[in-house]
Amino acid sequence: AHMDTLGGMVCSINEKGRLMLSALGGMNPNNAEAENCRVYTRSGKVYSGTFQLKNASIHVNGSYNDTARSYDAMEVVLDEPVESKADTEALGIMTGDIVCFDPRTTVTESGYIKSRFLDDKLSVGILLGFAKYLKESDKKPARKIYQHITVFEEVGHGGSASIPADVAEILAVDMGCVGDGLSCKETQVSICAKDSGGPYHYDVVSALIEAARTAKVDFAVDVYPHYGSDAEAGLRNDKD
């Protein structure tokens, strides 16, 4: 599983002292408009701001509804009295600083966890919970198991390094896709047979299906058209 997440990086400071961003991972600007964010500087200072359209007032911008939300059209407005690039630089903000968006985490009375960026922290929690269960129940797996938590999955190379040499099989535990053309529901285990990089190992997928059936787990098998995993990154780095 992976514990890294999506965000932004300052790629420039414009003449108004506002921040232009470049995506970290697949952070879609459509999903972050008007979101509160934090800017982490190299000096350790943290500044708050809002990620919004450059011409953000619908009362002023006649093209507001028609403007594509892209990183070129959007900016971070700092919660500081800055009016120029020099003002912002004086705060210690510079190109390369990390920008984190508010996850807006909520746990409902009915037990639902709602938040941005649950991908893939929930899976990390599940694996740690499984390890705790094995220890407390004094159960020993029939095979040697590593829990490998990566921190570069969202940028594509998380599973390509630091995999122990004696590993014979890699199972990537990640979010499950739900959407048009897929059969999985939010309450099921999702088994990915193929993603944008091609099919996964036939025998491994078959074994996962059989394990789910044996355990009487509700599951679905799907193809993810726009996805890649740490297991795929491992394969691309000769972890066959």
Positions of predicted regions on the chain:
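N-terminal hydrophobic/helix-forming segments and targeting peptides
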Residues: 1-240
